[in-house]
Amino acid sequence: MSRNRNVIGRNVARFRYQRGWSQERLAAKLQLLGCYMTRHIIANIETRRCVVTDVQIEFFTEVFGVDVGELFPQKRSLLQSM
């Protein structure tokens, strides 16, 4: 399976690590906000194995308390990751 299905996975993992959250804890926090998410889905997002919807992106910004632009890599690192 391709690992280039999203560009925000690495930053999702980074923000999660910064907060000391497990994938299960992040999934639970997202579920409390109304976003269906499991540890397995989080793992696939972080390893860039699945597409992330615009609605999921909104939930990630809310749960992490960041602007949407912070989820996306800088242009230079985006080009290097492809």
Predicted regions and their residues:
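Short, charged recognition helix plus adjacent turn
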Residues: S2, E62, G69-M82
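A short, Lys/Arg-rich alpha-helix, primarily the initiator
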Residues: M1-R19
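Short, solvent-exposed alpha-helical "recognition" segments
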Residues: Y36, R49-V52, L79
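Short alpha-helical DNA-recognition segment
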Residues: G20-N44
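Helix-turn-helix DNA-binding elements, focusing on the entry/boundary residues of the two helices
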Residues: V12, Q23, R39, D54-I57
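Hydrophobic packing within well-folded, soluble alpha/beta domains
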Residues: V12, R16, L26, F60-T61, ...
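DNA major-groove recognition helix of helix-turn-helix/homeodomain DNA-binding modules
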Residues: R49, T53-E70
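Residue-level detection of the helix-turn-helix DNA-binding "recognition helix"
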Residues: Y17, Q31-L32, T47-R49, R76
